[in-house]
Amino acid sequence: MTKKIVLQIAYQGTSYSGWQYQPNALSIQEVLETILKKIAGFRISVISSGRTDAGVHAQGQIAHFHCPDHPHFTDPRQIQKMLNALLPHDIVIRDAVMTDEDFHSRFSAIAKEYRYTLSLLPKPLPHHRLFCFSPRYKLNIARMQEAAQYLVGTHDFASFANLGREYSSTIRTLYTLDLSEQEHLVTVICRGNGFLYKMVRNIVGALLDIGKGKYPPEHLLDMLATKDRRKGPPSAPPYGLSLHHVCYPPPYQWFCKHEHNNSSEGK
């Protein structure tokens, strides 16, 4: 009888080509699957909740894999310990559970939260530099917060979806888009039912234009209306972005019960 193991994973994406396997570059998926093969003696495919891009980090990526009965795969806690003992320092298994066949890390998800960190310093502090973007110009955070509220709700986010991908629909719902300022760091908190390719980084890029005074906050309404990514600003760099957590419906709330119960999508 096969089992399905679910992992909660944190990683620093700096040295990786993203989550998904790439033939000529090292990915998070490849590192995990290589170590699982070393433990099990055969290839195990790991499926994530979504593909983070090169340089993007994660605090709460969720992934699952199937494996047949095997002495090393009977206890999720033991699996977590074995993986952490073999993984490099920039990938950590935060938790592991065993679940039923109905669960899927991608298709069972009901919400995701991304966080993008900005430094207000012209040169970020050394321990922040790999995890934040410093625009190096003065930002009006209040105007950015005002603008952000125009994107909350259900909209066609075609203007915020990078070209070169085909989408069955570009309509998404943002439950939260807030800016939290603490000392010299600003965190853009973006929670929604799903995200298009580079959507969060494109939203942050648009907010930066508002923050530096290039456009008024209402400009985001015009961007939504155009449905044309080519008229939008450049994407914010990847290294400021982190997948913070992924939420699932009952009974799959192992890793985010608190966040789910307090989220606006549950109201």
From Swiss-Prot:
Reactions it catalyzes: uridine(38/39/40) in tRNA = pseudouridine(38/39/40) in tRNA
Source organism superkingdom: Bacteria
Active site residues according to the UniProt entry: D53
Alphabetically ordered keywords of this record: Isomerase, tRNA processing
Claim: Isomerase is one of the keywords in the record: yes
Residue pairs linked by disulfide bridges in the UniProt entry: none
Xref: CDD domains: PseudoU_synth_EcTruA
Enzyme class per UniProt: isomerase
Listed GO biological process terms: tRNA pseudouridine synthesis
SUPFAM superfamilies to which the protein is assigned, alphabetical: Pseudouridine synthase
One Pfam family here: PseudoU_synth_1
A GO term for molecular function: tRNA pseudouridine(38-40) synthase activity
EC identifiers of the protein: 5.4.99.12
Residues holding substrate: Y114
Record text on subunit structure and interactions: Homodimer.
Protein family per UniProt: Belongs to the tRNA pseudouridine synthase TruA family.
Function of the molecule: Formation of pseudouridine at positions 38, 39 and 40 in the anticodon stem and loop of transfer RNAs.
Protein name: tRNA pseudouridine synthase A
Gene assigned in the entry: truA
